[in-house]
């Protein structure tokens, strides 16, 4: 029995002492005046009576009622029922009411009445003051309190003849039962009657309707969020204008938390004066009036629930973990069925007529039942995870959190983890974990209804029925007697508060009330206490939680087969069948990723320990330790699956004998795991073992098990009693035992705990002390690092005390082991553990002190034992490891560091790792890493014995290293943590290595330093290309690039010194200039041939330099420059010639200028430059000042058809053309005084414009009226037959087309440029393409003859950043979290590499269009050596078929990249000075663009895709000197540019990549494209949209059998033995073999048919003893035979056969058959669209075309008999006319044949080249063609006569001369 009310208080309004606008509450009277002993009077009650503050009102408000809750220091709750009414203010009372205070007032109570506004100031006589009647009770009977206080108020207001003192006295003396379902009727002496019902079980909360109201106000989702927030200890704040609703909401939320009790701050109604409580750091559930909502806005970590608005606001910084699935969705569905039953019927065709909805009270219980089911599902089986540590004198119970989470597979679940770590669950364990107590509904539910709930999950109606059954029980608990007599309580009238004749509430007589209270107290003392006996029983445990399969196990869900493999392997180990065990070991290690296999291993090992088979030999010991380490490596610090618990007794049992008296146990080899350094693991293990021994203590010997059994899991057999059952029985018997027996049991339990503490001190010392105790740090410091890709040793973990540092912070764990010895750290760790577990287990202080004394001795003894073990273990013979495989080295390649044993680990690539991806497990591989002067090489063999004896090779050039990172990884064999290195290269290779344990840290560091030294040498002369095969003489110190270079005189001297050293040692020929054949232009000359090209002394002084003649020394330099690629190409293009007399017609628009021969104007330009004829050399110096790096515009290519020129330069300076354009429309005095450089620049550009034939006659206006339609015809090739030929106008301004993010916005969907017809008829003669940022604000004048085209281009740093992302996408360092093709494509897209390729192709194609339409283009971007080079190279490649040959592409690279100064050394970071800048793949990006074009036009390129990969590999490898240094100037300074000219070709090593390519091309067709069938004058227009681009396989391919295939000498492995060499008697073996894409080199093991036949032919020739024929000659002969055969059979013409030989979608849109020599063309068009084809219909146009155009019409394939062919005009014999003939140059027969027509089979004549004496330029004679340039004539002088020839243009003539001379030189 308990008092219904403890105190009655009368509180009234009083003025504030500081005189502020608000008043304060004053307690007028309280009864009883003296505090109860068991319940003191709560302080601050006047604040809670008026939570919004004590304020006056201008009118009478109706009375209000609410119940506030106060919590005392003992966490006991007091319920304060407050009834407030208003009385007029007496005139004598001082009232202070300022306007400011009134403005701030908003509401006086929770009822929501209006406040006094500032517009109606109240007179003192009109104000009303609040007065409150308060009942304070420990019981929650709100309705009784409302009725009782209402009765007192009614007596006062209505003036009833009842004594208030008597009523209040009866109220304070009334007693009611606490629980048990009893019913009591009370009366307060005023004719009233009230019935009080107590709940059946007081542990179940009483909610009335609060839960249902909460769901109605907030909804399902919001309430679930608040529920999770309260459980995970977040701050929850309710807002409402009603205090009663605030109280009900808080009550409802607490009811939902049952069976957990909320133990933090709980204030349903918080007074305004205490709002600062909201800033407390601890969790809370608080209700605040909505009037103070503004003051809660700044709370950053508080979840606000607005009851009136129905919203829940969660701050961004707060994360509420949701319920784990499927509980979240299941709970939501059941709540929907309860709250909205009509939802299930809404879609029925014939819904039932009526649905009976539950009452509000019953719905409240149904909602609570849903959450009760939720907790039963969440906590099912929790009693099986309780550890009973002590039974007497009081139960001590601990919860095994890790086992509970592990059973459910919810270790990673944030919600459940936080719930189990919270204070509410700790209270739940201490309260409900007791085995012998009273039970309630939750205990029955979790013990007996779990199976039913699981069966009902898929049946919603059965779930709802169960919910209703539980709701009935909850309702019956609150209302045990349904038929309750009605209350009878006097109520005041409805408008009683408005009466004016109110009298104030009277002062009560204290004496009367106190007398009534004293009388009742005296009666209570004499009566016996009526206490209902509590029914206690054994709490049922219910079924154990069945093991849930690991949710994240993926492919490792263990099957019976995997467990069988584990058992077999262990059997083989203990039976000594080590070879069989070794074969099974990799499969076992993979299977041990699953929990079942790990438990199986522990069980099998335990069986062998029981059979006394724990002493092993060395090999058995190693196998067992490896399997244990594999088990433990996946154990978290929690050990949620009990694997470490099961292995702990085993690691102290298995051992091996090292020597007599010295035994090594397994624990010394499994210490490197984080679980051993986790205090929670040791505590759980300790409590589990103590429970086992306590249980054995109380079991009869016949019932139990021996105390020596080690248990990690609870026993679940039906015939055995659990520890909780034993404890329950003992607690039941405890009161019946004698005092002595009780004391004996207490001592036995304490002795058990004490002995286990000693036992665990020993165990912990075993696993914490390292084998080598002399180490200065603990082994555990490295545990748990995993495969972190950083060199940091810091540990970061979320698990509590999961690391050394964190465990120290949580009052356990190691201190910083660097500052103390190992023994001291272990002693402190063990002492903290002992303190914690012994204090919690109730061990006496004496025993605890004894333990502290014993721990240091235990540790010291173990250290002494370990010293002997460590000493003997060092004497063990080392495990025999695989023999190191020596790598194959290049000639001249030397080993810098011999092999260091490493493991090559799998990176993020899926190939080669086996498993689910398929294929053999080639990685991880065991071997060694070698560092040579050229490469980093790994050679080894896979660790998986099932793969076989496959050699794994992975290497890359040292110069290609881009990133080196130290990592810490687990070795794949012994699962130990080792230091490692991750090396990434720009050749798209990755070496992820873990050093073997025998490799010391010093050796690893030496390897890293040597690698760094080789990667970044101090000088370029220390690179492999220079040190290979030559001992160069050290020159002067390396030039510092930042210095201002030497003077012109010094530079000239240096240049001449190097030129004389390399060229001058040969005599200078005095013959006229005869250009060498194209076959030998770029090669060192034959040994017996002089290789000088001299400029004759007959030079005219005014032809090359406008001011003075060349000096003799300059002429030697000039002759060297003439040989360079630039000059050779200029002569081919007709841009300028250095003929015998160097005389040029003045009509030639361009000339070769030697102004930069000493590199005085621009060091990054070549020595000879093409400039307009009219520009003098002295003006070029001034022009160069307008451009960055002095790189002024020079011509680099000229269109043979439109005569438009392509120019390149650096970006413009501010005073260049930009300045002119900005000021051109506003004349001013400053404009007249323009800078001379700008004027010279303007003249220069004007000269370029004037050099174009069709613009030369125009007077400053680019009117194109004379521009014929023939020039607008399409002469290009599209990359698809289906290309649309729609004409698409792009607006009137090229600049606006190019400007913007997407550069060109064309309507073509595939990214193709518009057709030629898109250009407007009136366009500029010259387009200057520049950077948009540089040309910002420029408005070109349409009257100008050039036009600026501002575009947005990427910078070098963007290329570098994009390349880094591309590297990580193609060669990731670690496996993707979601391995799928989409993840690779997403990474590829994020790199933006293909977007940059797209932009480059798009700009290039547009420039091609402009050039093809007759406009010249100047590309002037950045400094002119990166993007500019990429664009101009691509433009020439697309426009000129010559550059698509092997020789032409070489010439293109030499000219545009090498001679024009691309900074290869700077962009490739070749030296230490460039280390900070890093690698920028500008040239590689260009090669990728060429690869994209090659894919779309495979028949237009003479070279193969492999050639591009070869260049991409070797431009970074530094094997050759070709791609070193930044300009010709630097190469001359080092003496490199001409050094190969004087050397002989017989050397072993090639210094030039081109020489290497030439040598290989003669031996193998690897660089040749068999589908090569070019069409001259083809302008390629590739599609450039990202969707049309492909990822280059250079980035992704892998050849683990031999490494990268780009070093040909290394890629050629030993030949396979012939079939006849099989051993005698051997069975015939199949020649079939498995080809692994990531292992084998597919071109070698699966060669294409042509290569295979060529190899076979060569082999047969060798067998027959015949000299082998070159493959190219064989191929040419085969093609000629094919052509001859097709001609004889009449199956078609050669050109059509060539087209049909390859997929025709790669061909042009038209196929042409020539009917006569220059006659009309018959078009067989594949598409009717004329704008996309290459057709012409007029023979007049055909006659005017260049020779290359005619060549495409007469084209056939190359053959043995047709080395070169084309049309030449030949003058007949004496007095015979000139006539066009078809000439064929035959290298094989060494003759020049001519035919009347191309199709003729019989020749008209033959010129034997053996009789030719000279080939010289000729002069026109009578009857020669009129339209041909005089330089197109040449003569062939033989021993018999002189033949006069005429080509159709100068380049064709030069080509014929070169070809004929090439044949002569080869003879």
Curated annotation (Swiss-Prot):
Domain uDENN: 7-184
Membrane-spanning residues: none
Reported consequences of knocking out the gene: Viable. Approximately 30% smaller than wild-type control animals. Males are sterile. Significant increase in the proportion of bundled axons with a diameter of >1 um. Significant increase in unmyelinated axons that are in 1:1 relationships with Schwann cells. Significant decrease in the percentage of bundles containing between 11 and 20 axons. Bundled nerve axons were incompletely enwrapped by Schwann cell processes, as evidenced by direct contact of axons with basal laminae. Number of axons per bundle not markedly changed. No impact on Mtmr2 protein levels in sciatic nerves.
Record GO biological process: regulation of cell growth; spermatid development; spermatogenesis
A cellular component annotation (GO) from this entry: perinuclear region of cytoplasm
Low complexity bias locations: 1723-1750
Taxonomy, superkingdom: Eukaryota
Gene3D superfamilies: 3.30.450.200, 3.40.50.11500, Pleckstrin-homology domain (PH domain)/Phosphotyrosine-binding domain (PTB)
Record region (Disordered): 102-121, 702-725, 1065-1092, 1260-1318, 1605-1633, 1723-1752
Compartment(s): Cytoplasm; Cytoplasm, Perinuclear region; Cell projection, Neuron projection
Sequence ranges assigned to domain cDENN in this UniProt record: 203-336
Domain PH positions: 1761-1865
Main location: cytoplasm
All copies of domain GRAM, residue ranges: 880-968
Assembly and binders: Heterodimer with lipid phosphatase MTMR2. Interacts with SBF2/MTMR13; the interaction seems to be independent of the coiled-coil and PH domain of SBF2/MTMR13 and independent of MTMR2. Interacts with KMT2A/MLL1 (via SET domain). Interacts with SUV39H1.
Matching PANTHER family: MYOTUBULARIN-RELATED (PTHR10807), MYOTUBULARIN-RELATED PROTEIN 5 (PTHR10807:SF43)
Similarity comment: Belongs to the protein-tyrosine phosphatase family. Non-receptor class myotubularin subfamily.
Protein name: Myotubularin-related protein 5
Gene: Sbf1
């Amino acid at each position: 029995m308990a008092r219904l009310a403890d105190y009655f208080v009368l509180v009234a309004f009083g003025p504030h002492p500081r005189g502020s606008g608000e008043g304060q509450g004053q307690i007028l009277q309280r009864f009883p005046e003296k505090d109860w002993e068991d319940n003191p009077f709560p302080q601050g009650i006047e604040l809670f009576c008026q939570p919004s503050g004590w304020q006056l009102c201008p009118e009478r408000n109706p009375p209000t009622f609410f119940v506030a809750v106060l919590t005392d220091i003992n966490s006991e709750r007091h319920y304060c029922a407050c009834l407030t009414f208003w009385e007029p203010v007496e005139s004598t009372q001082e009232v202070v009411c300022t306007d400011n205070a009134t403005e701030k007032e908003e509401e006086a109570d929770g009822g929501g009445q209006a406040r006094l506004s500032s517009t109606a100031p109240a007179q003192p006589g009109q104000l009303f003051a609040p007065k409150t009647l308060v009942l304070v009770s420990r019981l929650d009977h709100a309705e009784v309190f409302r009725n009782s206080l209402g009765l007192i108020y009614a007596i006062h207001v209505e003036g009833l003849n009842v004594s208030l003192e008597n009523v209040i006295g009866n109220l304070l003396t009334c007693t009611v039962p606490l629980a048990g379902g009893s019913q009591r009727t009370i009366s307060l002496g005023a004719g009233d009657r009230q019935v009080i019902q107590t709940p059946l079980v007081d542990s179940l909360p009483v909610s009335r309707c609060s839960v249902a109201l909460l769901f109605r106000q907030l909804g399902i989702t919001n309430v679930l969020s608040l529920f999770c927030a309260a459980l995970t200890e977040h701050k929850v704040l309710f807002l409402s204008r009603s205090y009663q609703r605030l109280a009900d909401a808080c009550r409802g939320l607490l009811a939902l938390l049952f069976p957990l009790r909320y133990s933090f701050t709980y204030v349903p109604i918080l007074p305004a004066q205490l709002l600062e409580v909201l800033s407390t750091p601890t969790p809370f559930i608080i209700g605040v009036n909505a009037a103070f909502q503004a003051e809660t806005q700044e709370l950053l970590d508080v979840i606000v629930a607005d009851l009136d608005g129905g919203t829940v606001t969660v701050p961004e910084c707060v994360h509420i973990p949701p319920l784990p699935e499927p509980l979240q969705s299941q709970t939501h569905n059941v709540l929907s069925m309860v709250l909205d039953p009509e939802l299930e019927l809404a879609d029925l065709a014939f819904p039932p007529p009526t649905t009976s909805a539950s009452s509000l009270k019953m719905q409240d219980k149904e909602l609570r039942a849903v959450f009760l089911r939720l907790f039963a599902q969440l906590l099912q089986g929790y009693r099986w995870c309780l550890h009973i540590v002590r039974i007497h004198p009081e139960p001590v119970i601990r919860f095994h959190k890790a086992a509970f989470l592990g059973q459910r597979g919810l270790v990673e679940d944030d919600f459940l983890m936080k719930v189990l770590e919270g204070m509410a669950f700790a209270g739940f364990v201490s309260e409900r974990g007791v085995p012998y107590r009273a039970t309630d509904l939750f205990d029955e539910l979790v013990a007996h209804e779990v199976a039913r709930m699981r069966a009902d999950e898929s049946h919603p109606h059965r779930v709802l029925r169960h919910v209703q059954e539980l709701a009935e029980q909850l309702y019956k608990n609150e209302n045990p007697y349904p038929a309750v007599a009605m209350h009878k309580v006097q109520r005041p009238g409805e408008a009683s508060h408005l009466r004016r004749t109110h009298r104030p509430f009277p002062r009560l007589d204290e004496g009367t009330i106190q007398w009534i209270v004293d009388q009742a107290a005296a009666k209570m003392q004499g009566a016996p206490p009526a206490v209902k006996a509590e029914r206690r029983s054994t709490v049922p445990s219910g079924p154990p939680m069945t093991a849930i399969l690991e949710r994240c196990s993926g492919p490792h869900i263990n099957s019976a087969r995997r467990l069988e493999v584990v058992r077999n392997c262990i059997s083989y180990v203990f039976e000594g069948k080590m070879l069989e065990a070794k074969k099974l070991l990799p499969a076992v290690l993979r299977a041990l990723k699953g929990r079942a296999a790990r438990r199986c291993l522990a069980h099998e090992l335990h069986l062998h320990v029981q059979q006394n088979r724990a002493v092993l030999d060395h090999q058995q010991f190693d196998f067992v330790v490896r399997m244990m380490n594999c088990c433990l490596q996946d154990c978290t610090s929690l050990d949620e699956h009990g694997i470490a618990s099961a292995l702990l007794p085993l690691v102290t049992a298995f051992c091996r004998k090292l020597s007599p008296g010295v035994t090594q146990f397994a624990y010394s080899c499994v210490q490197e795991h984080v679980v051993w350094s986790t205090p929670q693991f040791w505590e759980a293990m300790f409590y589990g073992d103590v429970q086992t021994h306590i249980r054995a203590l109380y079991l009869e010997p016949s019932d139990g098990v021996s105390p020596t059994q080690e248990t990690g899991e609870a026993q679940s057999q039906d015939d055995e009693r659990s520890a909780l059952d034993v404890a329950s029985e003992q607690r039941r018997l405890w009161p019946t035992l004698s005092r002595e027996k009780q004391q004996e049991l207490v001592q036995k339990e304490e002795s058990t705990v004490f002995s286990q503490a000693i036992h665990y001190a020993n165990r912990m010392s075993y696993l914490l002390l390292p084998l080598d105790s002399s180490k200065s740090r603990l082994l555990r410091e490295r545990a748990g690092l995993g495969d972190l890709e950083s060199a940091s040793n810091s540990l970061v973990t979320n698990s509590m005390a999961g690391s050394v540092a964190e465990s120290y912070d949580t009052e356990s764990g190691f201190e910083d082991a660097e500052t103390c010895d190992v023994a001291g750290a272990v002693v402190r760790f063990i002492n903290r553990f002992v303190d914690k577990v012994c204090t919690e287990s109730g061990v006496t202080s004496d025993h605890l002190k004894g333990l502290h004394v014993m721990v240091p001795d235990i540790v010291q003894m173990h250290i002494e034992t370990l010293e002997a073990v460590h000493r003997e273990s060092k004497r063990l013979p080392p495990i025999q490891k695989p023999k190191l495989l020596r790598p194959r080295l290049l000639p001249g390649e030397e080993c810098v560091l011999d092999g260091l044993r490493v493991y090559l680990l799998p990176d993020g690539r899926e190939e080669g790792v086996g498993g689910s991806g398929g294929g053999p497990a080639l990685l991880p591989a065991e071997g060694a890493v070698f560092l040579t002067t050229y490469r980093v090489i790994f050679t080894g063999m896979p660790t998986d014995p099932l793969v076989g004896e496959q050699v794994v090779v992975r290497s890359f050039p040292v110069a290609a290293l881009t990133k080196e990172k130290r990592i810490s990884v687990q070795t794949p064999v012994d699962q130990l943590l080792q230091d490692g290195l991750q090396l990434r290269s720009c050749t798209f290779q990755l070496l992820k290595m873990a050093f073997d344990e025998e490799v010391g840290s010093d050796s690893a560091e030496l390897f890293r330093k040597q690698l760094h030294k080789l990667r970044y040498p101090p000088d370029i002369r220390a690179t492999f290309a220079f040190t290979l095969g030559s001992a160069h003489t050290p020159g002067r110190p390396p030039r510092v690039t930042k210095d201002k270079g030497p003077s012109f005189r010094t530079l000239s001297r240096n240049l001449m010194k190097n030129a004389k050293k390399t060229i001058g040692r040969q005599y200078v020929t005095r013959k006229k200039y005869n250009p060498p054949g194209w076959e030998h232009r770029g090669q060192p000359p034959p040994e017996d041939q002089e290789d000088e090209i001299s400029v004759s002394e007959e030079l005219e002084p005014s032809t090359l330099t406008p001011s003075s003649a060349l000096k003799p020394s300059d002429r030697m330099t000039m002759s060297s420059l003439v040989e360079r690629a630039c000059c050779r190409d200029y002569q081919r293009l007709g841009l300028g010639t250095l003929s015998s007399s160097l005389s040029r017609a003045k009509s030639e628009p361009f000339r070769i200028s030697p102004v930069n021969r000493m590199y005085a104007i621009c060091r990054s330009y070549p020595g000879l430059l093409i400039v307009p004829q009219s520009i003098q050399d002295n003006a070029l110096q001034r022009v160069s000042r307008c451009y960055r790096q002095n790189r002024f515009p020079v011509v680099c290519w000229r269109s043979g058809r439109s005569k438009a020129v392509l120019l390149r330069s650096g970006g413009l300076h501010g005073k260049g053309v930009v300045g002119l354009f900005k000021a051109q429309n506003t004349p001013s005095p400053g404009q007249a005084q323009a800078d001379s450089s700008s004027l010279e620049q303007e003249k220069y550009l004007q000269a370029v414009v004037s050099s174009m034939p069709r613009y030369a006659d125009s007077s400053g206006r680019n009117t194109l009226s004379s521009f014929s339609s023939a020039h607008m015809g399409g002469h290009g090739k599209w990359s698809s037959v289906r290309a649309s030929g729609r004409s698409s106008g792009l607006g009137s301004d090229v600049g606006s087309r190019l400007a913007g993010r997407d550069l060109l916005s064309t309507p073509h969907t595939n990214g193709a440029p518009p057709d030629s017809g898109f250009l407007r008829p009136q366009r500029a003669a010259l387009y200057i393409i520049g950077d948009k940022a540089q040309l910002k604000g420029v408005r070109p004048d349409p009257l100008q003859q050039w036009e600026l085209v501002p575009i947005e281009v990427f910078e070098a740093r963007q290329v570098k950043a994009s390349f880094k992302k591309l590297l990580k996408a193609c060669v990731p360092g670690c496996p993707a979290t979601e391995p799928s093709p989409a993840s690779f494509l997403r990474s590829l897209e994020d790199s933006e590499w293909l977007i940059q390729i797209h932009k480059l192709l798009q700009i290039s194609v547009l420039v091609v269009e402009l050039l093809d339409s007759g406009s010249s283009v100047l590309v002037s971007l950045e400094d002119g050596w990166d993007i500019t080079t990429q664009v101009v190279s691509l433009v020439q490649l697309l426009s000129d078929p010559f550059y698509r040959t092997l020789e032409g592409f070489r010439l293109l690279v030499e000219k545009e990249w090498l001679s024009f100064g691309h900074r290869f050394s700077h962009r490739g970071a070749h030296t230490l000075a460039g280390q900070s800048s890093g690698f920028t793949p500008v040239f590689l990006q260009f090669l990728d663009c060429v690869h994209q074009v090659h894919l779309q036009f495979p028949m237009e390129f003479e070279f193969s895709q492999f050639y591009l990969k070869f260049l991409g590999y070797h431009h970074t490898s530094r094997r050759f000197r070709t791609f070193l240094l930044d300009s010709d100037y630097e190469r001359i300074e080092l003496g490199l540019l001409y050094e190969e000219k004087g050397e002989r070709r017989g050397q072993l090593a090639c210094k030039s990549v081109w020489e290497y390519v030439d040598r290989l091309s003669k031996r193998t067709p690897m660089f040749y494209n068999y589908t090569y069938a070019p069409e001259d004058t083809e302008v390629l227009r590739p599609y450039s949209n990202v969707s049309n681009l492909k990822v280059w396989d250079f980035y992704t391919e892998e050849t683990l059998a031999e490494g990268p295939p780009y070093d040909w000498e290394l890629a050629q492995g030993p030949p396979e033995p012939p079939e006849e060499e099989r051993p005698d008697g051997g069975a015939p073996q199949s020649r079939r073999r498995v080809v692994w894409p990531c292992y084998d080199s597919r071109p070698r093991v699966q060669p294409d048919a042509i290569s295979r036949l060529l190899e076979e032919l060569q082999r047969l020739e060798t067998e027959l003893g015949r000299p082998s024929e070159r493959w190219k000659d064989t191929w040419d002969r085969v093609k000629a035979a094919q052509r001859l055969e097709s001609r004889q059979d009449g199956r078609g013409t050669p050109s059509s056969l060539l087209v049909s030989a390859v997929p025709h979608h790669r061909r042009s849109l038209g196929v042409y058959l020539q009917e006569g020599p220059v006659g009309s063309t018959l078009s067989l068009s594949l598409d009717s669209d004329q704008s996309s084809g290459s057709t012409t219909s007029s023979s007049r146009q055909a006659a005017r075309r260049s020779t290359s155009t005619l060549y495409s019409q007469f084209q056939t394939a190359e053959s043995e008999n047709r080395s070169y062919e084309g049309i030449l005009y030949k003058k007949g014999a004496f007095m015979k006319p000139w006539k066009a003939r078809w000439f064929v140059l035959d290298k094989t027969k060494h003759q020049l044949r001519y035919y009347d027509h191309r199709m003729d089979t019989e020749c008209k004549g033959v010129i034997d080249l053996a009789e030719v004496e000279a080939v010289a330029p000729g002069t026109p004679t009578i009857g020669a063609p009129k339209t041909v340039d005089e330089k197109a004539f040449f003569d062939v002088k033989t021993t018999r006569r002189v033949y006069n020839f005429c080509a159709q243009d100068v380049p064709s003539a030069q080509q014929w001369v070169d070809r004929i001379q090439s044949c002569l030189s080869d003879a």
